[in-house]
Amino acid sequence: MKICVIPGDGIGVEICAEAVRVIDALKDIHGLKIEYEYGLLGGAAYDQTGRPLPVETLRLADEANAILLGAVGGPKWDKLPAESRPERGLLGIRKYLGLNANLRPIKVYPELANASTLRPEVVSGLDMMIVRELTGDIYFGQPRGIRTSGFERVGYNTMEYSESEIALIAEMAFRIARQRSGKVMSVDKMNVLECMQLWRDVVTKVGERFPDVTLDHMLVDNAAMQLVKNPKQFDVLLTGNMFGDILSDEAAMLTGSIGMLPSASLNVEDKGMYEPCHGSAPDIAGQGVANPLGMILSAAMMFRYSLGRPDMADAIESAVQTVLTNGARTRDIFQAGDRLVSTSEMGGLVEAALRRIS
């Protein structure tokens, strides 16, 4: 197996190192044959090559079974032309690899229920999956741009979805729901957007092929409210690209820290890019205080969805649970009575727990 490791920008370098450390432990314990190739993306790629997505990185990603990504972006590159910004590199590699589905599990560990800004009884036991379409919608629709009209500038973007794009992501959501509670909530804005009217129609038709799965629909503004009012009503939440971008970050804070959350971006062949939900956090980069658990749990998702080793995923997740139960916390999830640890210390504790339980 070959993994393309892309540390990226900011804290991505630190947290990627801890994920590799955990994978190395699994290699040592179980004799796994895994090779690493390191690539550049985002601001780091621009600084070294003048491009946010070098051709060499695409080659490495093509040859790998999976891609492990730290984080991309930062204010250092905000004034670059749009086509040179780090985020364009991220969108580009997603499009190149055909990563049409983003999976974001939202899980509240019992030990962290008090870390949420919501009451513990509202979030305790929360375990949901957000399934977000990743290659269509307003982020990729054409035409787009800024033009001059009369005496002022006008910015414009195009929200667009094809039936096939919607059907593809809907099918994935229904398949995942079959392995969980059998419930899908599709989020749209069909009351004002024709694009979302098509979304609801196609999702409904796909749902007819899954009679064992219950499908409901909800407008995005109501969904945003319900996520903080009663999040445990959701199991699989199906969304388009832009709405999913917003709702997944909102849902992330239900857990107490976005640093806890992994994600997977998959294509139809289950090749995936795995990254934590948080950004590059340049304000804390290099200080050793970043939470690596979202990155480590992303590696667990990699074993589950792309490498065909759900047993390795289970082992990593059990090790993380053990470390949290024992009271270790990075700064973002630290509360009185906990044991404060650094980025590398947290990675070391997960590695040690993994070796004990394997």
UniProtKB/Swiss-Prot annotation:
Pfam assignment, any one: Iso_dh
Pathway(s) per entry: Amino-acid biosynthesis; L-leucine biosynthesis; L-leucine from 3-methyl-2-oxobutanoate: step 3/4
Record: residues binding NAD(+): 74-87, 279-291
Cofactor info, note text: Binds 1 Mg(2+) or Mn(2+) ion per subunit.
Broad class of enzyme this protein falls into: oxidoreductase
UniProt-listed Enzyme Commission number(s): 1.1.1.85
SUBUNIT field: Homodimer.
PANTHER family: 3-ISOPROPYLMALATE DEHYDROGENASE
Annotated family: Belongs to the isocitrate and isopropylmalate dehydrogenases family. LeuB type 1 subfamily.
Name by which UniProt lists this protein: 3-isopropylmalate dehydrogenase 2
Species classification: Bacteria, Pseudomonadati, Pseudomonadota, Betaproteobacteria, Rhodocyclales
